């Protein structure tokens, strides 16, 4: 498994341990590449064809043939993060960006464990569908 990430990325901080456990459980070697030093690799796995979102986990066969890849966070987190943002702005219409970011981090931190479980489920489904 190839993983792209950076130490400062919130999703990387939340997701790296989960990815390491997945690799360990599956008996996979995990190689980590800093995104900002490997734009050539990162450009192959842009989210929605434009965003350098991390972490990215890329799965290969033993022969190094591509199987599939997973980017950033589970779909459930994407939906909930959007809802959290809307809720914060509705509660505080004049909130500045710094306070907004702080409030969003506080609320998303409470969901991290559930999102890790959702990530594992998503990875299982993705791999099962890709290996058929």
For the regions a protein language model found, what residue spans apply to each?
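Non-globular targeting/processing and membrane-anchoring segments
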Residues: 20-25, 29, 44-53, 62-132
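Conserved redox-active cysteine motifs that mediate thiol-disulfide chemistry
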Residues: 7-14
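Thiol-based oxidoreductase modules, predominantly thioredoxin-like and allied folds used
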Residues: 2-7, 19, 27-42, 52, ...
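Flexible, glycine-rich phosphate/dinucleotide-binding loops
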Residues: 10, 39, 76
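A short secondary-structure junction signal
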Residues: 14-15, 68
